Amino acid sequence: MSDIEQRIKQAVAEQLGMRAEEIKNE
């Protein structure tokens, strides 16, 4: 896996985590 792919996956995981937190707070 390339470095760019790893960074994209990390960014997506962070965004999904943030969305999950937002849904929990509502």
From Swiss-Prot:
Pathway: Lipid metabolism; fatty acid biosynthesis
Residue ranges constituting the Carrier domain according to the UniProt record: 2-26
Intracellular or extracellular location(s): Cytoplasm
InterPro entries, sorted: PP-bd_ACP (IPR009081)
Signal peptide: none
Processing and modification events after translation: 4'-phosphopantetheine is transferred from CoA to a specific serine of apo-ACP by AcpS. This modification is essential for activity because fatty acids are bound in thioester linkage to the sulfhydryl of the prosthetic group.
Family: Belongs to the acyl carrier protein (ACP) family.
Function in brief: Carrier of the growing fatty acid chain in fatty acid biosynthesis.
Name of the protein this chain belongs to: Acyl carrier protein
Organism: Acinetobacter calcoaceticus
Gene: acpP
